[in-house]
């Protein structure tokens, strides 16, 4: 599954906001606008994506 910079940024925005526990996939999906599948993909590959997109 391909994750874009915009999708990763949406995930990081929720993470930095502190509004929810990041393991609550449903809430993270709602706040970020990402599908649950994409949210899980970002969680699984966070380090790789973080290195790729420079956060």
Predicted segments, located by residue:
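N-terminal acidic leader/helix
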Residues: 1-30, 45-55
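Short, basic interhelical loop/turn and adjoining N-cap
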Residues: 29-41
């Amino acid at each position: 599954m391909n994750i874009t910079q915009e999708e990763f940024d949406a995930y990081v925005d929720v993470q930095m906001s502190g509004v929810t526990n990041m393991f609550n996939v449903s809430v993270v999906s709602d706040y970020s606008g990402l599908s649950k599948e994409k949210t899980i993909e970002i969680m699984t590959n966070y380090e790789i994506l973080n290195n790729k997109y420079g956060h």
